[in-house]
Swiss-Prot record:
Top-rank lineage group of the source organism: Bacteria
Protein name (record): Delta-aminolevulinic acid dehydratase
Binding sites annotated in the UniProt record for 5-aminolevulinate 1: 209, 221
Complexes and interactors: Homooctamer.
Organism expressing this protein natively: Chlamydia muridarum (strain MoPn / Nigg)
Binding site for 5-aminolevulinate 2: 278, 317
EC nos: 4.2.1.24
GO biological process: protoporphyrinogen IX biosynthetic process
CDD domains (alphabetical): ALAD_PBGS_aspartate_rich
Family: Belongs to the ALAD family.
Gene Ontology annotations for the cellular component aspect, listed alphabetically: cytosol
Gene behind the chain: hemB
Active-site residues from the entry: 199, 252
GO molecular function terms attached to this record: porphobilinogen synthase activity; zinc ion binding
């Protein structure tokens, strides 16, 4: 056979698994992953969420057993979300400031049992309000400054309970500065802030709202969440949050916004966390359950793409599976 006179043959670097692994530009490790946990009052609870196959609502006793298993295979960080009964919700989300609510007790118990874990608490009102909005909803509007004051109180409470990092997800103006000042005044100078800096008004949040029963009852979240068409606005939000005292910024969703992740990494000196949201996860799971694609392959590829775009860490509902694959050196790439 006559060979073509090719000086460059890039395929030489792909001819074996050993070579491909040696020169790989992006790798996944267990410390890249943050596991989101839905906590619910009660005991013995492990309820699968229909719109999120493989994701569960947990009571504190059952999550402790699962965390024990996952810590043995490399889990380093979790972020907590509360599932609140309707009778404990009101217009103002007052139960969010109660020191015995499920997220406060979750922070305490998880830090006590697993002190090595980084525990991140989501700072939001939508699980606690009857409106389902991320702030105080009044006269068809989410009130910015009044909501920010409440978030300062909630963040300080979570810091007191032992949260390593608080994560305000509301997209209210000025909330990072207020939370930082409030926590510092109360002596929690070492509690970090992971700000949801660019939280887009996405159609991909539906399964998450199913999990928390927090669908907005009226009004429009586009009044405060970002327009999916905008990227410069996201960079402005990242810079503002850095100036206000954030320790990390977040881009949410992740997979549809890889360009934003890349540009955010270039515009800030802070770590950039990306959230692979419920809709992204559920699309992959639905297709895999129909046999249309490989669950392992699609999840791994999606997370690799997010990290390749520049994410420092990734919040993903697939974290338990990925930890298992990493522990067995069984990632499909």
């Amino acid at each position: 056979m006559t060979r073509l006179p090719l000086l460059k043959r890039p395929r030489r670097n792909r001819k074996s698994a050993a070579i491909r692994s040696m020169i790989r530009e992006t790798n996944m490790v267990s410390s890249d992953l943050i596991w989101p946990i839905f906590l619910k009052e009660g005991s013995g609870i492990r309820e699968e969420i229909p719109s999120m196959p493989g994701v569960y609502r947990w009571s504190l006793d059952t999550i402790s057993r699962e965390l024990e298993r996952l810590c043995l295979i490399g889990l380093k960080a979790v972020i907590l979300f509360p599932v609140i009964e309707d009778q404990k919700k009101d217009q103002f989300g007052a139960y969010a400031s109660h020191p015995y609510n499920i997220v406060c007790r979750g922070i305490q118990e998880i830090k006590k049992s697993f002190p090595q874990l980084c525990v991140i608490s989501d700072i939001a009102l939508d699980p606690f309000t009857t409106s389902g909005h991320d702030g105080i909803f009044y006269n068809n509007e989410v009130l910015n400054d009044e909501s920010v004051r409440v978030y300062g109180d909630i963040a300080t409470l979570h810091a007191e309970m032992g949260a390593d990092i608080v994560a305000p997800s509301d997209m209210m103006d000025g909330r990072v500065r207020h939370i930082r000042e409030k926590m510092d005044q109360m002596g929690f100078v070492n509690t970090g802030i992971l700000s949801y800096s660019a939280k887009y008004a996405s159609y991909l949040y539906g399964p998450f709202r199913d999990a928390l029963s927090s669908h907005p009852q009226s009004g429009d979240k586009r009044q405060y969440q970002m327009d999916p068409a905008n990227v410069r606005e996201a960079l402005l939000e990242c810079r503002l949050d850095e100036e206000e005292g954030a320790d990390m910024v977040m881009i949410k969703p992740a997979g549809f916004y890889l360009d934003v992740i890349m540009k955010a990494q270039e515009c800030t000196h802070l770590p950039v966390v990306a959230y692979q949201v419920s809709g992204e996860y559920s699309m992959i799971m639905a297709a895999s359950l129909h046999g249309w694609l490989s669950k392992e392959g699609a999840i791994s590829e999606s997370l690799l793409a997010i990290k390749r775009a520049g994410a420092t860490a990734i919040i993903s509902y697939a974290t338990p599976w990925v930890l298992e694959w990493l522990a067995r050196d069984a990632l499909p790439f």
